[in-house]
Amino acid sequence: VRQTDIAGNTSAATSFSFTLDTSAAAPGVALTTDSGSSTVDHITNVGTLNLTSVETGATVEYSIDGGHTWNTSFSATEGVNDVQVRQTDIAGNTSSATSFSFTLDTSAAAPGVALATDSGSSASDHVTNVGTLNLAGVETGATVEYSIDGGHTWNTSFSAVE
């Protein structure tokens, strides 16, 4: 930039450079670990997120209430987590939000076990001539394993022995 005054004198040039930044891209969001039997079902026992396309120096914000409030940190809770993520770059541009949903499941309840038939002289003495078990509380998709040696070895099938 330079100027010429009304007397016809031209100043030395002043250099000035700047970067015009008018937008911020929405960040990519994925689970850090999608654990369990499927690596793409968004069910995990680790509730941390992996963000991509975050600009250097940008502030990342999370919303768990549909975008009404935003925070700079996020902690997953047991069960379904619906989170939105956005970034505000160093120029002050705020991206659109990326929505991501996943289920955090950090524990499996012990299943209930009972004899299918307690045929002994008492219906509650666990003496039977039918070695079939009934299970309760097994989660859909869970793998059931049996141990007959105090938990040293486990198998997915069970056959009662006399």
Regions found by a protein language model. Give the residues of each.
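Low-complexity, disordered linker/stalk regions enriched in Pro/Thr/Ser/Gly
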Residues: 1-162
